[in-house]
Amino acid sequence: MSATRRTIASAGSIVVKIGSSALTSLVGGLDVGRLDALADAIEDRMRAGSDVVVVSSGAVGAGLAPLGLTKRPRDLATKQAAASVGQLALAHAWGTSFARYGRTVGQVLLTADDIARRAQHRNAQRTLDRLRALHAVAIVNENDTVATAELRFGDNDRLAALVAHLVGADALVLLSDVDGLYDGDPRKGNATLIPEVNSPEDLDGVVAGSGGALGTGGMASKLSAARLAADAGVPVLLAAASDAGAALRDAGVGTAFVARPSRLSARKFWVRHAADEQGILHIDEGAVRAVVTKRRSLLPAGISAVSGRFYGGDVVSLLGPDERPVARGVVAYDSAEISDILGKSTQELPAEMQRPVVHADDLVPL
């Protein structure tokens, strides 16, 4: 067994993301038998000593049958109506299933905005930490009833990766209707399972298919989430929900994604992956070398242009001369102030304007 699989198998804190297809039937509504089997596997892992946070899809799918709908709606209003009905059913089903073991569950509904805004980010973190301390099972889902962008393709996979870093998890397990990553379309019979992904180069030529009939997150979404988590220092296991027992027992199934050696700090992870980008700073080649290679602060002299309207404390993207993003960071000045000082050396500026535009501690190269 690889070192990554051993790390996942022995992880003291795990986030388990469960896709819609693993929880709902083809005609809509929850499949209680599947859900109970997943709860059994999670309970076994918790009894073995691990803390587990569950990121559960399925609200929209669970709301279809009660509303007389036979397929996933395309319009936002109907999706949100289905989510409002299904969320109740989903929370009740998880609560009933874990009650067999005397476990209490807590529902945590999040939107991307809750992760992107620093204050809400910290509040969500404290809530999840407290639920774990009280030995309750946190059932996390997107707040689909009020969200807009969050109902787009694959967002719950990304949410799971963000939650994994939010709670300081030692591993992320993605469970769905696929049993791992293949080098081609497994439905065509000539594809080979990729047991471990060590770097982005391992994904060259890999075909990312679409999601299932009831889900929104296809393989491309899962790969993106796995890369995000692994880049943040969290190893990932992608496996079939039907193999949940083995996945959570010894990580001996599916595809494992090797994490980077060091974990990003909570603040730098937030800057790089969670915060909304409010504007753009265009920088010259010298500034690119200073920021990316030498990991130094961004000074006004290296900025050639400003795009967007933003304020001190906002997160912006830094683009090099080829217009490609090279870093993200927290700016010290408003966009109007930067426009007045860009291209100037520090010595040309008044004392109160001699701080770096983006300090090295607030910069994250991409």
From Swiss-Prot:
GO CC annotations, alphabetized: cytosol
Keywords (A to Z) from UniProt: Amino-acid biosynthesis, ATP-binding, Cytoplasm, Kinase, Nucleotide-binding, Proline biosynthesis, Transferase
Protein name as catalogued: Glutamate 5-kinase
Binding site for ATP: 17, 176-177, 216-222
Main location: cytoplasm
Catalytic activity, reaction form: L-glutamate + ATP = L-glutamyl 5-phosphate + ADP
Domain PUA residue range list: 278-352
Record-level GO BP terms: L-proline biosynthetic process
EC number: 2.7.2.11
Superkingdom of the organism of origin: Bacteria
Biological classification of the source: Bacteria, Bacillati, Actinomycetota, Actinomycetes, Mycobacteriales
SUPFAM superfamilies: Carbamate kinase-like (SSF53633), PUA domain-like (SSF88697)
Presence of keyword Nucleotide-binding: yes
UniProt-listed CDD domains: PUA_G5K
Enzyme class: transferase
Location relative to the cell: Cytoplasm
One example GO MF annotation: RNA binding
Pathway: Amino-acid biosynthesis; L-proline biosynthesis; L-glutamate 5-semialdehyde from L-glutamate: step 1/2
Family affiliation: Belongs to the glutamate 5-kinase family.
Source organism of the structure: Rhodococcus jostii (strain RHA1)
Statement: the UniProt record of this protein carries the keyword ATP-binding: yes
One Pfam family named in its UniProt record: AA_kinase
